[in-house]
């Protein structure tokens, strides 16, 4: 089902992510908090995203190793990701907003993995999904606009110097 995959944000640990036998060290996560991991996948065929219903096939298996606070014993949790697809506009607004944040990080880094996305795409996703009651989300929208102005100026200066 999957031809290639990449854990976004772990470009410096690409070999470790590619080897499914290696445990990746993570940071500490306090009680009541959560973490979100983004994987970019290259499907083995276009059919993967056309079938939106449950198929019985699994897309991936996520293995999580963790320990409880003040405990040295490691516990494991394994979860099979079903091979079903949900249109982006149908997922939770929080996940849509988190996607805009991830795209922003890739764009600022000038990652080769986000060359087809423009600042307006990031802004539109964030604008459509942010909660106006959450100050940090509103501030993020301003940050996207500021970054666009700065990075667009850099691009224009570079273009003029290339002439």
Task: Annotate each language-model stretch with its function.
Residues 1-69:
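Acidic, polar loop-rich interaction surfaces within structured domains
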């Amino acid at each position: 089902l999957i031809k290639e995959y990449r854990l976004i944000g772990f470009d410096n640990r690409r070999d470790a992510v590619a080897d499914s036998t290696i445990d990746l060290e993570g940071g500490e996560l306090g009680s009541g908090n959560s973490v979100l991991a983004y994987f970019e996948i290259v499907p083995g065929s276009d059919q993967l995203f056309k079938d939106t219903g449950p198929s019985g096939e699994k897309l991936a298996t996520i293995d999580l190793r963790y320990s409880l606070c003040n405990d040295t014993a490691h516990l494991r949790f394994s979860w099979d990701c079903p091979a079903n697809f949900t249109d982006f506009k149908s997922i939770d607004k929080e996940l849509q907003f988190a996607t805009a944040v991830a795209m922003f990080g890739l764009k600022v880094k000038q990652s080769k993995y986000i060359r087809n996305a423009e600042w307006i795409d990031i802004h539109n996703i964030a604008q459509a999904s942010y909660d106006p009651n959450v100050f940090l989300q509103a501030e993020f929208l301003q940050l996207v606009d500021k970054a666009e102005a700065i990075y667009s100026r850099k691009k224009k200066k570079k273009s003029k110097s290339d002439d």
